[in-house]
C-alpha cells in the first residue's frame, strides 16, 4: 500500500508512510502525521487516512493522502479505489485546489500537485474531522510523555469508525464525491 503526500514546489514528495524531517522542516505536525502514516501502513486499515487533506500551517500547507489504484487493502470492502488530480479530474473540488495553490503561509511554496483519496464517504469524512480536531488539540503536546496515549486514542477511534463503516456497508454504495465509484 502506497501513501503519498501532496507535492509542494521545491520539496520532494514523501512516500511509503514516512517523511524526512529535513524535507518538511518547521512542520509542527510532523510527528503526528509521521505516526499516522506508520500506523496506516502497518495496521492494514490505511484507507481511513485517505480523507485527511487540507491546508495546514507552515511547511505542511497542502498535505494530502492518496492510495494509488490497485494498492488497497483487500479487507476493506471498497469496490474501487482511485486517485485523481483535484484541479483537472474533479471540477467540484476546484475551489479547494485554488485555495491550496494560493494560500500558502509566508515563506512556504504553494502546492503544485495534490492528490486525494477516492473511496471514503460520510464515515471517512468523520475520520478526517476527528483527526484534524486532534491535530489541533495536540498541537503543543509534542515531546510530552502523554503524546503516545493521545496517538493511541486517535488510532483506536479510526479503527472503531472503520468497523462502523464496514458493518453498515456505507462504502459499498459508492461515494458521491468520487466519480469513479458511481
Curated annotation (Swiss-Prot):
Domain of life: Viruses
Descriptive protein name: Protein K4.2
Species assigned in the record: Human herpesvirus 8 type P (isolate GK18)
Gene of this entry: K4.2
Amino acid at each position: 500500500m502506497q501513501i503519498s503526500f501532496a507535492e509542494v514546489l521545491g520539496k520532494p514528495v514523501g512516500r511509503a508512510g514516512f517523511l524526512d524531517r529535513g524535507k518538511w522542516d518547521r512542520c509542527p505536525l510532523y510527528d503526528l502525521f509521521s505516526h499516522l502514516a506508520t500506523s496506516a501502513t502497518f495496521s492494514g486499515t490505511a484507507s481511513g487516512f485517505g480523507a485527511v487533506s487540507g491546508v495546514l500551517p507552515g511547511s505542511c500547507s497542502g498535505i494530502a493522502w492518496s492510495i494509488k489504484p490497485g494498492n488497497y487493502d483487500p479487507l476493506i470492502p471498497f469496490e474501487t479505489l482511485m486517485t485523481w488530480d483535484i484541479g483537472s479530474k474533479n471540477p467540484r473540488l476546484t475551489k479547494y485546489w485554488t485555495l491550496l495553490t494560493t494560500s500558502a503561509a509566508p515563506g512556504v511554496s504553494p502546492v503544485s500537485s495534490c492528490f486525494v483519496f477516492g473511496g471514503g464517504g460520510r464515515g471517512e469524512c468523520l475520520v478526517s474531522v476527528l483527526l484534524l480536531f486532534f491535530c489541533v488539540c495536540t498541537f503543543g503536546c509534542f515531546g510530552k510523555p502523554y503524546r503516545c496515549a493521545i496517538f493511541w486514542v486517535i488510532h483506536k477511534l479510526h479503527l472503531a469508525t472503520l468497523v462502523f463503516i464496514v458493518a453498515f456497508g456505507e462504502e459499498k454504495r459508492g461515494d458521491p464525491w468520487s466519480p469513479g465509484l458511481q
